[in-house]
Regions:
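Active-site microenvironment of metallo-dependent hydrolases
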Residues: 1-48, 52-53, 58, 107-109, ...
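Divalent-metal coordination cores built from histidine and acidic residues
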Residues: 2-20, 25, 100-211, 523-528
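Solvent-exposed alpha-helices and their adjacent loops that cap or buttress functional pockets
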Residues: 22-24, 43-44, 66-67, 136-138, ...
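Divalent metal-coordination and catalytic microenvironments
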Residues: 34, 55, 78, 89, ...
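Active-site beta-loop-alpha junctions enriched in small/polar residues
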Residues: 91-93, 119-121, 149-154, 185-188, ...
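Histidine/acidic residue-rich metal-binding segments in metalloenzymes
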Residues: 129, 164-184, 190-257, 264-285, ...
Length: 601
């Protein structure tokens, strides 16, 4: 199975590798006189040649004897070469584009492989959604390796999703081509609590000899972390403190340090490496969630590597964190992750080690991108019709749908549980605030930066909804709505008044899902996401333009935080601390219990 991500399996071409290395058979391509970033020994080797045949590296050293009349020679004098970059944890759906369009954005940035967790579309479309993503990936040269979603729903019993995944589904998916392991195990309470179905999922993965990826988001480095790792979980991307990273690596867990469009954990947690004299083979850099405007304006892993270097990380180490360390984490280092004989010829070229900007990307020995542009054609997408029909709210949404009745006997104010977001972080705070009551209904309070929020179930026409209040976005007017609302991806609406909230909600119902901003009875911006309410197959630049218009609309309404729609999308995710709102109600994610909206109740 592992060889399916290379042009040819090594067992088919071992004789060719030997012949080319010895010069008996000439190489298809030779890279001459490069500065090799050797991720195996953490050194720069000057004047290195690389001979390539059948998509693999046959020789590293002096390749003069490997050059024949038909050999393509690439003069890399003065340039650095490194293994292709790999993202160890990514949700392509968060980029709002198909895998094929995603490849067009990231391959020119030096990304040659990703380990994607398609649990967003799985929450809407079930296992079929995972197959759709795997199939879509086949139209591009990007090595889009997939993990089977583990927690659908994210935390059972707290929300309603479009589908559910159980151990027998995991057993089936582990037999699929393209599946590398189990997606992030978000249900850490059930792991450490030895819940039967969750541990059955772990067992099915381990029996298939695949790896389990993690999501341990609580600040516990004692018995709970040990129980989690001892259950077979190999890596985690949810560290928000340097001590979390350090303890995870000390316990043999790969620490995937995140730097996405909205989650800027890396500058804080990389201090685990910078401030301690430790072996960092268990450290990786990942993106998790990246918006199209970030991909266009800043880049992908190349951007994260540059940011890590600016934080003080040695450039060679930064490159190791997106190459050999990732490959080893996923037990793929025998195939990729280094420029060494026998490995896939996934290679990136750049001029400056301190400011890494990719000039050429090679995958399986073929130059697929150069100077920021793809060199190969990627065919059109072909999605099944049913993924374009996933908005099943089941009842009319009007301004009255957003009224929140005050408890009996309430005075002019009522003490209310409010979710306060933390910009650029995945966590939030529970606050108890006095909110105004008018004509028997609880109102938003712009003076406290508090707006109203409702989550409507949109998969099975159940008519259920959760109501709450939200602080920290800075809205002075208007409303927003989005169907990108992790992980159930129900219809999330927040705003300052009921009329604008209703208009925002109905705008998305009519267009099949997406994100929109509304103010004063007018739609300011819409990002249509008709594929499961999560993605569009428009080119990434067109999507980036739509997102930029949405961002401008949010600013017009008063919100100036970074990637606010991504922060908003996490408000319903009931596996992250502290307080969340799903279609079933408010969830205290420290105790995993529903709590009343009003503190007096």
């Amino acid at each position: 199975m592992l060889n399916k991500f290379c042009k040819k399996p090594l067992y088919e071409v071992t004789r060719t590798m030997a012949r080319v290395a010895m010069g008996v058979q000439k190489a298809e391509t030779v890279i001459k006189n490069a500065r090799l970033v050797n991720v195996c020994t953490a050194e720069i080797q000057e004047g290195i040649d690389v001979a390539i045949a059948e998509g693999r590296i046959a020789l590293v050293g002096d390749a003069s004897h490997c050059i024949g009349p038909e050999t393509k020679v690439i003069d890399a004098s003065g340039q650095y070469i490194a293994p292709g970059f790999m993202d160890g944890h990514i949700h392509v759906e968060s980029s709002m584009i198909s895998v094929g369009e995603y490849a067009k954005a990231v391959v020119p940035c030096g990304t040659t492989g990703i380990f994607m967790d398609p649990h967003e579309i799985c929450n809407v479309c079930g296992k079929d959604g995972v197959r759709i993503m795997i199939e879509d990936a086949k139209r591009s040269p990007l090595k889009a390796m997939s993990n089977a979603p583990s927690c659908v729903p994210a935390v059972a019993g707290f929300e309603d999703t479009g589908a559910a995944i159980r151990a027998d589904d995991i057993r089936e998916m582990m037999t699929w081509d393209g599946i590398m392991g189990l997606g992030e195990m978000m249900s850490f309470p059930n792991v450490i609590g030895a819940e039967e179905n969750i541990h059955a999922e772990l067992a099915e993965t381990l029996k298939s000899d695949n790896i389990i990826t993690g999501h341990f988001s609580i600040p516990d480095t004692g018995a709970a972390l040990n129980a989690y790792i001892a259950s077979g979980i190999r890596c985690c991307h949810e560290s928000t403190r340097a001590e979390d990273v350090l303890e995870k690596m000390r316990h043999g867990m790969y620490a995937l340090m995140r730097y996405g469009s909205a989650w800027h954990d890396m500058p804080v947690i990389i201090k685990a490496v910078l401030d301690n004299k430790i072996d960092d083979r268990f450290a990786c850099l990942i993106s998790d969630d990246t918006h199209p405007d970030t991909l266009i304006n800043e880049g992908h892993l190349d951007h994260i590597v540059r940011c890590a270097i600016k934080e003080g990380l040695d450039p060679i180490k930064a490159i190791q964190y997106v190459t050999i360390n990732v490959a080893t984490c996923f037990r793929m280092d025998h195939e990729m992750g280094s420029i060494t004989p026998g490995k896939c010829a996934d290679i990136v070229f750049f001029d400056d080690l301190q400011d890494i900007c990719i000039t050429r990307t090679m995958i399986d020995g073929d130059v697929v991108a150069e100077n920021g542009q793809m060199c190969v054609e990627i065919g059109p997408a072909n999605f099944p019709e049913h993924v374009f029909h996933t908005m099943h709210v089941g009842h009319p949404i009007t301004a009255e749908s957003f009224r929140i009745a005050a408890p009996a006997g309430a005075g002019k104010t009522v003490k209310t549980r409010v979710i306060e977001i933390i910009p650029n972080r995945v966590g939030n705070y529970e606050r108890l605030l006095d909110l105004p009551v008018k004509d028997g209904f609880v109102e938003p309070d712009a003076g406290q930066d508090v707006m109203k929020m409702v989550v409507f179930e949109r998969h099975h026409e159940t008519g259920t909804k959760g109501v709450g209040f939200l602080k920290g976005f800075g809205f002075k007017k208007g409303a927003m709505a989005q169907t990108v609302s992790h992980d159930a991806h129900n219809l999330l609406v927040a705003g300052t008044n009921d009329a604008d909230m209703a208009l925002a909600a109905n705008t998305l119902v009519e267009c099949g899902g997406g994100m929109c901003a509304v103010a004063d009875g007018k739609v300011l911006a819409v990002v249509p996401l008709p594929i499961a309410g999560l993605m569009n197959d428009l080119p990434v630049r067109e999507m980036a333009e739509l997102v930029a218009k949405l961002d401008a609309a949010w600013k017009q309404m008063g919100c100036v935080i970074n990637s606010p729609y991504m922060t908003m999308a996490l408000v319903p995710l009931a596996c992250l601390p502290e307080l969340r709102l799903t279609n079933r109600g408010l969830v205290d994610c420290r105790t995993f219990r529903f709590v009343p909206l009003f503190a007096e109740e």
